[in-house]
């Protein structure tokens, strides 16, 4: 039986979050054993924040939740691909659909999308 190797990176594995219909990469984050268990049990994307040292459900503040459709691991069982239905349009905390909206072009990084929401309004502290 395949077991995810959480030991290789100190209890975490990278998780590539991808749109299940278009295969667009929405974000990359880290997941630990508890977050994976919550993801599989609830059908929502749960991640582990290294900066806040806590578990969080994607969309818990913005409302832009993700409904898990499929979960894959790689051949070494040390990385995940989580295919989701993205609710609310934006997966990125900047308000963009994807966290990968900046492209290298002619020697500079160039933004290639407009935010779908204002993060200052959504994440008021």
Swiss-Prot record:
Question: What pathway is this protein a component of?
Answer: Amino-acid biosynthesis; L-histidine biosynthesis; L-histidine from 5-phospho-alpha-D-ribose 1-diphosphate: step 3/9
- According to its UniProt record, the EC number is 3.5.4.19
**Which residues are Zn(2+)-binding?**
75, 92, 99
Q: What GO CC annotations are associated with the protein?
A: cytoplasm
Cofactor(s) of this protein:
Mg(2+); Zn(2+)
Quickly give the catalysed reaction. Answer: 1-(5-phospho-beta-D-ribosyl)-5'-AMP + H2O = 1-(5-phospho-beta-D-ribosyl)-5-[(5-phospho-beta-D-ribosylamino)methylideneamino]imidazole-4-carboxamide
Chief localisation class: cytoplasm
Where is Mg(2+) annotated to bind?
74, 76, 78
Among InterPro entries, the record links this protein to: PRA-CH, PRib_AMP_CycHydrolase_dom, PRib_AMP_CycHydrolase_sf
Superkingdom, according to UniProt? Bacteria
Q: Name one GO molecular function term.
A: phosphoribosyl-AMP cyclohydrolase activity
How this chain assembles, per its entry, is: Homodimer.
User: Known HAMAP family for this protein?
Assistant: HisI
Against PANTHER family, the record matches this protein to: HISTIDINE BIOSYNTHESIS BIFUNCTIONAL PROTEIN, HISTIDINE BIOSYNTHESIS BIFUNCTIONAL PROTEIN HIS7
Q: Which family does it belong to?
A: Belongs to the PRA-CH family.
Q: What does this protein do?
A: Catalyzes the hydrolysis of the adenine ring of phosphoribosyl-AMP.
Q: What is this protein called?
A: Phosphoribosyl-AMP cyclohydrolase
Q: Which organism is it from?
A: Syntrophotalea carbinolica (strain DSM 2380 / NBRC 103641 / GraBd1) (Pelobacter carbinolicus)
The organism's taxonomy opens as: Bacteria, Pseudomonadati, Thermodesulfobacteriota, Desulfuromonadia, Desulfuromonadales
């Amino acid at each position: 039986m395949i077991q995810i190797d959480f030991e290789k990176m100190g209890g975490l594995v990278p998780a590539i979050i991808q749109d299940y219909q278009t295969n667009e990469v929405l974000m990359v984050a880290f997941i630990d054993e508890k977050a994976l268990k919550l993801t599989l049990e609830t059908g929502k994307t749960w991640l582990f924040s290294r900066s806040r040292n806590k578990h969080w459900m994607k969309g818990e503040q913005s409302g832009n939740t993700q409904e898990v459709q499929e979960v894959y691991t790689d051949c070494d069982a040390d990385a995940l691909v989580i295919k989701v239905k993205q609710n609310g349009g934006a997966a990125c905390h900047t308000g963009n659909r994807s966290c990968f909206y900046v492209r290298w072009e002619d020697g500079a990084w160039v933004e290639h999308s407009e935010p779908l929401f204002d993060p200052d309004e959504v994440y008021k502290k």
